[in-house]
């Protein structure tokens, strides 16, 4: 009787240990921050790829916020100010190239543009002009 009880307890212990191990393994497979995009950025940590900066950035840290329009957008300049990159709330970012000897950047494919008017940064996108808050 003691041997049977001992074997039953041993069997239950092994089963419980196996269940805990598989649950732990499943949890480790989905760690926060383990997701990476094609550029190596971690979206769950707030990072997105910037073509203007050629780096993973957090938009609220590296960019200028514009929320005076129908959607919130962010603007990031390249280090040499050759490019301005617009990040809309939805969709892909939009690259605008600087027009020589001016304070304006234009997108070749669309109507989007960035310009500085009397020291105020303006972003024109989807027939709406976003202005920087002071």
State what each model feature region is.
Residues 1-5:
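Positively charged n-region of N-terminal signal peptides that target proteins for export
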Residues 9-12, 34, 49:
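Residue-level signal for mature regions of secreted extracellular proteins and peptides
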Residues 15-18:
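C-terminal motif of bacterial Sec signal peptides marking the signal peptidase cleavage site
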Residues 20-31:
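Short, low-complexity, disordered segments immediately C-terminal to signal peptides
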Residues 35, 111-134:
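C-terminal partner/receptor-binding element of secreted or periplasmic proteins
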Residues 39-44:
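Disulfide-braced loops of extracellular cysteine-rich modules
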Residues 47-54:
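Extracellular, cysteine-rich, disulfide-stabilized repeat modules with beta-strand cores
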Residues 59-103:
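Mature extracytoplasmic domains of secretory-pathway proteins
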């Amino acid at each position: 009787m003691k041997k049977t009880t001992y074997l039953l307890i041993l069997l239950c212990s092994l089963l419980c240990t196996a269940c805990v191990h598989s649950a732990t393994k499943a949890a480790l497979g989905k760690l926060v921050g383990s997701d990476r995009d094609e550029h190596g950025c971690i979206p769950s940590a707030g990072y997105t790829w910037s073509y203007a900066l050629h780096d993973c950035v957090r938009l609220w840290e590296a960019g200028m916020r514009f929320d005076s329009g129908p959607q919130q957008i962010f603007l990031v300049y390249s280090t040499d100010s050759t490019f301005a990159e617009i990040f809309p709330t939805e969709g892909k970012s939009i690259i605008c190239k600087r027009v020589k000897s001016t304070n304006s950047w234009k997108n070749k494919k669309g109507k989007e543009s960035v310009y500085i008017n009397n020291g105020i940064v303006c972003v024109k996108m989807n027939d709406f002009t976003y202005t920087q808050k002071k």
